[in-house]
Design a protein with these regions (language model features):
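Carbohydrate-binding surfaces of carbohydrate-active enzymes
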Residues: 320, 339-363
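Active-site mouth of glycoside hydrolases
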Residues: 37-239, 249-251, 265, 269-272, ...
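Bacterial N-terminal signal peptides
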Residues: 18-26
Length: 363
């Protein structure tokens, strides 16, 4: 073969290769552009939360008081919840309880979320057995659950509750995701894994429209990052969770928890979402090393670093109508509240539902 022919063949092969790559990229882009989603339902594209065809993140708060649990001075009236939700950035997610003991207010919360265009992350049980969720608790409030509850005990009360809740609200876009249980523990990790996988499959069976989130601690509670990853390797679990209160640990002023990176890596290897379901800093008007203003600044830094590194959402613990003590709880007069209302990611989400969609919507 002449040098001229060889050069000609190489050029043709290069052109063919380039054309193939271009075709693959264009098909991939077309697939993304035409992906199906249900309008106003939160979903995921791998490790990225999505809403109406747009990437989604938020910085928000927990408030178990919204479900009716708490001291009288902490609780919100129906009118106050209406006003509270009206102030929130559109499409923000609020995490609260919908446990067997405190699901009587869920209808109202969903109604208010629909009215004000926000979303709810609802936890279906409390592994710490708080707020009256004493099923499986060895010693009442805050005592956790016995190991046998995660093996068989959950089938008596909790499982019917799960089926009832997810069936009832399966068509409600106001639900951002279902949390299987808050902070499962007190059993070996294999038992907890089997429990999470079973409940996730049940939820998806009765409600294929919503994301399923684990509710877990970080990997330390389950023997390390590999076990944490195994807890989430079910195809029916979409979102992993970690809770961290490391700022006050040994007065370290920690911003990025040392548990975050291994949890994020585990979820990225599974091509799934990670959220920071709880983070908090002690403060208040009494004797405390951290002022409310300092707490707000530190929490802004936490929001920034977790979202920049890939978390889908971050939730501060914990909003109540009024906070009377030094602690993690904050009220509407706290700088944290203003931070949440004005945080850039939340303001961006406010316009998501008003965009012209180029992607295919499911009815």
């Amino acid at each position: 073969m002449s040098n001229k022919e060889s050069t000609y063949n190489k050029k043709n092969r290069l052109l063919a290769f380039t054309a193939s790559i271009t075709l693959i990229l264009s098909l991939s882009s077309a697939t993304i552009a035409q992906e199906s989603y249900k309008k106003d339902f939160l979903y995921r594209r791998g490790t990225q939360l999505m809403l109406n065809g747009e990437p989604y993140q938020c910085a928000s708060f927990n408030s178990f008081q919204l479900c009716g649990c708490g001291h009288d001075y902490e609780l919100f009236s129906d009118c106050q919840i209406d006003s509270l939700f009206a102030l929130l950035p559109k499409n923000i997610i609020v995490r609260t309880w919908a446990t067997p003991a405190f699901s009587h207010r869920t209808d109202f919360l969903v109604e208010m979320a629909r009215k004000h265009n926000i979303k709810l992350l609802l936890s279906l049980a409390d592994g710490r057995s708080g707020c009256g969720d004493f099923d499986g608790a060895p010693n009442g409030d805050g005592s956790g659950k016995i190991a046998d509850w995660y093996k068989e005990g959950y089938r008596k009360k909790y499982l019917p509750h799960v089926i009832e809740m997810v069936s009832k609200y399966k068509d409600a876009p106001e639900i951002a995701m279902w949390e299987i249980i808050n902070e499962p523990a007190d059993a070996d990790w294999l038992t907890i894994r089997d429990f999470l996988h079973h409940i996730a499959a049940i939820i998806k069976k009765y409600d294929p429209n919503h994301l399923v989130e684990s509710g877990t601690f970080a990997g330390w509670a389950y023997g390390g990052a590999d076990n944490y990853k195994a807890l989430h390797d079910s195809p029916n679990i979409d979102v992993g969770n970690l809770h961290e209160y490391d700022y006050d640990y040994e007065n370290s002023n920690t911003i990025e928890s040392w548990h975050f990176a291994p949890c994020l890596k585990a979820m990225q290897e599974l091509d799934k979402v990670l959220i920071v379901g709880e983070t908090g800093i002690n403060s208040g008007d009494g004797d405390c090393r951290t002022t409310r203003s300092q707490r707000c600044d530190a929490m802004r830094s936490k929001f920034d670093i977790y979202l920049q590194k890939g978390a889908g959402a971050v939730f501060v613990w914990n909003l109540a109508r009024e906070s009377r003590n030094v602690g993690l709880t904050f009220g509407l007069d706290d700088p944290l509240w203003d931070l949440i209302l004005t945080y850039p990611a939340n303001e961006r989400n406010s316009t998501t539902s008003n965009k012209n969609y180029t992607q295919k919507e499911k009815p």
